[in-house]
């Protein structure tokens, strides 16, 4: 055997009681678990094996981030401590219906501009990513060999990654960016693309139903695509049509749609936001309980913070986004069109802003792609507008034009009681929704998992520690259909994290969002240390995790 983790408090990912044990690792897998209660001598030190004294530390499966935006970060940054230092050993990317495969050349260029605020990688970016893939299989292969020959210990990526087929990208490549129903031939073409992507290893399909162009798909189109996903045993992960005024209706739509399709459902960042939803999480959970009791297969993820994070352009009404990024900029430059957008945003409530009239004092600029605009970062749109002596919409419009739709934002619209109620639920998992771009990203990107463990489990007692760990490990592994991950069990892959239950905490704050966590001294992927004594090693043990893997 290669490694002995001695005298650890094992929290195995099932939600059951923890226990003290020696855990051995050999050839990248857990080879033995000797519980203290078993009696007899402790596990001897084998010749050549390393022994880590884990007394006082909890040993858990590596954490699974069910909602990540590291699609390019994994290719750009071999260190990727934003996730590795949290104990994350697997991320699910391809989220919110927009990512970089499957694509043709034209669609790739459009998608790069559309989500530069999430991931960087805009059309003019020179950040070391060469975009030399077009299919999902080619993208996953690229992850597997991202840093070969670059002098690291391993040539893959920092942590493992699973991929969802992005429905909006599929629609962009087949239908375009127009607001119209797909023809029968177009629907068939989209079904083929989704099927091919699942055959190449995608674990399911995502949608962004407040983002262009995925938002233009009707229920019939989405149901047809979900039937394809169901045939392959995948799941549908929608960012649904409203988290505000129409939130419950939007959740009902997703439950009904996947029920008709016979498809498993995973609700992305399942929140109830804005003033209209304060204290309404129990209504959502009652809806889900009824569906679960009737036999539906549903899970969800959340992050343990009240503010949200997205792009400023996502706030616009859907008609303003028709035609894609170039058409959006044309409308913003046209005074009459811009005034129509302002009226819907401020006085009616745009679907992009979840049907709620926008409150500019809750919209904080967290990042821009143009350094000349950096003075706006960390200020609300209302504050920037006041400094310039202009109306908030004037400031927002100018930022969108000058930064070519690039600004990212924090939305201060959540409610603590809703966050706590949803994280207690039996189908809850953890997902950071971590956007790594911008000068002041949301701290969830660097802090979600230690924040669950330190603040919500230990300090507030919202969840017992063993149950909290299950939400972050065993439960998401089951949703992904992973047979040998997510549990501390003999034969499982040694994707493991050792943390101090007494000190683990997120270091990231809204003021210093890139500060790394404390209390997580060791993280292993395939039995190899990616975090050792609290520091990132040069090990790149991560690979793509494909459907059925």
Each predicted region: which residue ranges?
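Acidic, glycine-enriched loop/beta-strand segments at the rims
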Residues: 11-22, 407-413, 418-419, 460-469, ...
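Structured alpha-helical segments in the cores of large, soluble enzyme domains
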Residues: 189-202, 218-231, 247-260
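C-terminal cap of metal-dependent C-N hydrolases
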Residues: 334, 421-427, 432-433, 448, ...
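Histidine-rich, glycine-flanked metal-binding segment
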Residues: 1-4, 10-62, 77, 506
């Amino acid at each position: 055997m290669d490694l002995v983790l001695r005298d650890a408090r094992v929290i195995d990912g099932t939600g059951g009681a923890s226990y003290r044990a020696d855990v051995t690792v050999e050839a990248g897998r857990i080879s033995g678990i000797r519980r203290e209660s078993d009696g007899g001598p402790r596990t001897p030190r084998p010749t050549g094996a390393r022994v880590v004294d884990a007394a006082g530390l909890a040993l858990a499966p590596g954490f699974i981030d069910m909602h990540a935006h590291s699609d390019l970060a994994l290719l750009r940054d071999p260190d990727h401590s934003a996730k590795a230092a949290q104990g994350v050993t697997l991320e699910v990317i391809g989220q919110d219906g927009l990512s970089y495969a499957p694509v043709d050349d034209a669609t790739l260029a459009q998608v790069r501009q559309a989500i530069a605020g999430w991931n960087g990688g805009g059309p003019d970016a020179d950040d070391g990513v060469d975009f030399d893939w077009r299919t999902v299989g080619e993208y996953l292969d690229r992850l597997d060999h991202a840093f070969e020959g670059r002098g690291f210990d391993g040539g893959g990526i920092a942590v493992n990654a699973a991929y969802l087929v992005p429905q909006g990208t599929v629609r962009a490549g087949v239908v375009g960016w127009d607001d119209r129903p797909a023809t029968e031939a177009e629907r068939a073409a989209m079904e083929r693309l989704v099927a091919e992507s699942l055959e190449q290893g995608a674990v399911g399909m995502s949608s962004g139903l407040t983002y262009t162009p995925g938002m233009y798909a009707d229920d019939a189109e989405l149901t047809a695509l979900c039937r394809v996903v169901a045939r392959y045993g995948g799941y549908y992960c929608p960012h649904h049509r409203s988290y505000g005024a129409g939130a419950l209706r939007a959740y009902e739509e997703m439950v009904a749609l996947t029920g008709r399709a016979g498809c498993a459902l995973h609700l992305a960042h399942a929140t109830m936001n804005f003033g209209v939803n304060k204290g309404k999480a129990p209504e959502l959970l009652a809806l889900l309980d009824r569906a679960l009791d009737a036999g539906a297969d549903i899970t969800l993820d959340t992050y343990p913070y009240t503010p949200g994070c997205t792009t400023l352009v996502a706030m616009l009404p859907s008609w303003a986004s028709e035609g894609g990024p170039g058409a959006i900029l044309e409308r913003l430059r046209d005074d009459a069109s811009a005034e129509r957008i302002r009226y819907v945003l401020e006085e009616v409530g745009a679907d992009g802003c979840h049907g709620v009239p926008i409150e500019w004092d809750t919209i904080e600029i967290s990042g821009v792609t143009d350094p000349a605009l950096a003075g706006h970062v960390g200020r609300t749109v209302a504050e920037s507008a006041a400094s310039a002596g202009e109306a908030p919409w004037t400031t927002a419009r100018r930022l969108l034009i000058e930064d070519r739709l690039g600004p990212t934002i924090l939305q201060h619209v959540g409610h603590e009681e809703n966050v706590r109620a949803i994280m207690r639920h039996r189908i809850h998992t953890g997902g950071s929704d971590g956007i790594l771009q911008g000068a002041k990203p949301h701290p969830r990107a660097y802090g979600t998992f230690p924040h669950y463990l330190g603040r919500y489990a230990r300090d507030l007692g919202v969840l017992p520690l063993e149950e909290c760990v299950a939400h972050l490990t065993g439960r998401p592994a089951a949703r992904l259909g992973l047979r040998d991950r997510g549990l501390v069990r003999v034969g499982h892959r040694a994707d493991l994290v050792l943390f101090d239950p007494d000190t683990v905490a997120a270091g990231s704050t809204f003021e210093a969002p890139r500060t790394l966590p404390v209390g997580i001294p060791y993280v292993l992927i395939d039995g190899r240390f990616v975090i050792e004594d609290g520091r990132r090693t040069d090990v790149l043990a991560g690979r793509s995790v494909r459907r059925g893997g």
